[in-house]
Amino acid sequence: MSHSTHPVTDRLPGIEAVLVALLAGVAGVAGSFAVAAFTPAFIAGPIAGFMARTLPGALITFSIVVLGDLGSQLNVLLAVGLSTTIFAVAALLGQAVGQRTAYPIAGVVAAATTALISVAITAAPTPSVVAGVATGTVVLLSDLSQSQAVSSHTADLSAGRRRLLAAVASAASLGIGGYVLGSQQSTQVSPPTLEGAQPWAAPEIEPLLAEAAEKSLGVSGLEPLVSDRFYEVDINSTDPTLDATSWSLTVTGTVDRELSYSYEDILSMEVDHQFVSLRCVGEALNGKKMDNALWTGVSIMDLVEPAGLPEDCCVMLRAADGFYEEFPLSALQDGFLAVGMNGEPLPRGHGYPARALIPGHWGEINVKWLTEIEILEEEQDGYWEERGWHGTGPVNTVAKLHVINTLDDGRKQVGGHAYAGVRGIDRVEVSTDGGDTWADATLSEPLPGTDVWRQWTYTYDPPGGEHEVVVRATDGMGALQPEEKSSPFPSGPSGWVTKTVR
């Protein structure tokens, strides 16, 4: 046996040290997740957000248009991988220090370094300490395992193998445990208890939701008029967690006087309940990022007009997650500040404690986690405009085809949703022969409100064999949806939806 200063680590092959470090990194990430769950306090959250904000606009556009939801998932996976690598470096540092001292110090150094790095990235002490302990534990247990093997004069290969197996076992235990604990945590936030101030529980909400259920066409597989899986699109992979008791909304910029509103101020105002649909500018033509909900809130103009507004220009909405969007001040006239959704407090993923709703416009300007309304004297680029998008205008008219059912009598039933913003939907037509002939679809009765979608359905005898079904909509102004297809980038998708039916 070698008589070096520290035979345990001197005998350790480099590849084994790296593998142990990577396993320790996995445990550290799991430890962070166990406490933080999928919030900004989770180590991968800020890293994923940083990548999303700093990657070239062309790459972000490719991810949105080509990869869709897969792009967001890959961003998270890459962030987890980078987090693991960062913690692995801390584990390697611990092993390097351990070569020059007694072996237990390696785990301590790895733990301390991991915790310090995590705090610097997340500003969250508790998840960082747990991440450090998890990382250090794997390093410590693997060192102890090999130390026992060396002390008993076990062969080098066996000692190295024991070290690696100890790292695998401890990392697996900590990793699985951390994932289970983190997954079981609720990432929702509850509104503060304010006596008598729960506008989302108003008695008129249940009848409105019941009306929407009644007006839904009941087509199998078709999402109802009030969406049960409302889409979410954000610039970060983790949503901010805001405390409503300390949250405030400010009105700033070129105003006569700046104003600030607390959550309690908002809830004490006269509220309204509105059905409003939203559609993502970056979705595919027949994608599923278009939904509808019953929102509870107050008029944005009631908040900004007391500040004294200029004649005309524009407004910048800023959010707690670093997002910001600019659009004409005129679009704010019918703006709505939502604090409730479908009879519940606004969910965290949809902007708790408050979000903006700008009727008839693409989803990107309906800013979540709203903290500031800045009135501008001249135009500025918003977050997505800086990346080449132009999604601050009115939404394009669309009729989507999401359901193709075969009925018991052999007939085909197709269905979907149609939406044209505040222009409304007057008509949906269906062609079952590739666009040669057209027939009117059945539309759901309109919901109360000016910015809502409608369901449509059409049943027909199939011609036999493969055929093309095409759908198109006419808005409430009498304008037919344009036929020519366009990419989501930069101003949103357009065109008639076509599907092959067999």
PLM regions with names:
Residues 1-102:
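Membrane-anchoring hydrophobic segments
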Residues 70-73, 175, 375:
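A short hydrophobic/aromatic micro-motif that marks alpha-helical segments and, especially, helix-coil
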Residues 145-152, 182-190:
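Juxtamembrane/interface segments at transmembrane-helix termini
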Residues 132-145, 170-184:
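Alpha-helical membrane-embedded segments
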Residues 84, 184-502:
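Structured, non-membrane catalytic/scaffold regions adjacent to prosthetic-group chemistry
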Residues 20-28, 83, 110-111, 135, ...:
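Hydrophobic alpha-helical membrane-embedded or membrane-associated segments
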Residues 153-173:
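N-terminal secretory signal peptides and thylakoid transit peptides that target proteins
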Residues 2, 83-159:
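N-terminal secretory signal peptides
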